[in-house]
Design a protein with these regions (language model features):
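Phosphate/Mg2+-binding loops and adjacent switch elements
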Residues: 1-52, 56
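Beta-strand-loop-alpha "switch" segments that mediate conformational coupling across diverse proteins
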Residues: 56-67
Length: 189
């Protein structure tokens, strides 16, 4: 909710006034902020959308599985007890790093790149050196980054993406009702 901007947050995003077009409000990553902060955000949104009472939903990001560059799916349990080297070229890599730290593994190194980073051969060589230097058994990145990298990993260190899903922690039925109303032949609630 940085700078009172939406989708997701930041200076170049939807202004708070954009809530006037909303039918539902979904607050993401609620496990990363306090209950008080969530309440403040909820109240700010309610003021913006008054007198309408919009459904309010909260979500968390939850790791689902691992995906290799060749599309192979591996269970999250493959991380347990292993030494991981993580990296990401996304706008805010800290939550991704936190998700890796939350796994039952040892995150032995992490490197951040700028958002939308175009990985070069030199970058791959640097990542390979860093991962080997810290004794990583597995390199883990985002799906967004995985597609920009060689399919064979980092110089012998297997490379996977942590697949992250959204889990609704409050009122998922409200979203289901909103989506059902969009189906042909259905009317809005």
């Amino acid at each position: 909710f940085g700078c009172y901007r939406l989708l997701p947050r930041g200076l170049l995003r939807e202004p708070l006034a954009g809530l006037s077009r909303a039918d539902t409000i979904i607050l993401t990553r609620t496990d990363r902020v306090s209950r008080e902060t969530r309440h403040e955000i909820h109240q700010a949104c309610r003021r913006q959308t008054a007198p309408r009472e919009l459904p309010w939903l909260e979500t968390i990001h939850r790791p689902r599985e691992l995906r290799a560059a060749d599309g192979t799916i591996r269970p999250l349990t493959d991380l347990i007890g292993r030494s991981l080297f993580g990296f990401a070229g996304i706008g805010n890599p800290a939550p991704f790093q936190s998700l890796l730290e939350d796994q039952q593994a040892d995150l032995v190194g992490f490197t951040s790149f700028a958002d939308h980073h175009p990985y070069s051969a030199d970058d791959v060589a640097m990542l390979s050196r860093q991962a080997r230097a810290v004794g990583a058994e597995l390199a883990v990145t985002t799906l967004k980054d995985l597609v920009k990298l060689p399919r064979d990993g980092l110089a012998g260190i297997p490379l996977v993406a942590l697949v992250i899903g959204i889990e609704f922690t409050t009122n998922p039925a409200a979203l289901e009702q909103q989506l059902a109303a969009l189906q042909p032949g259905k009317s809005s609630p």
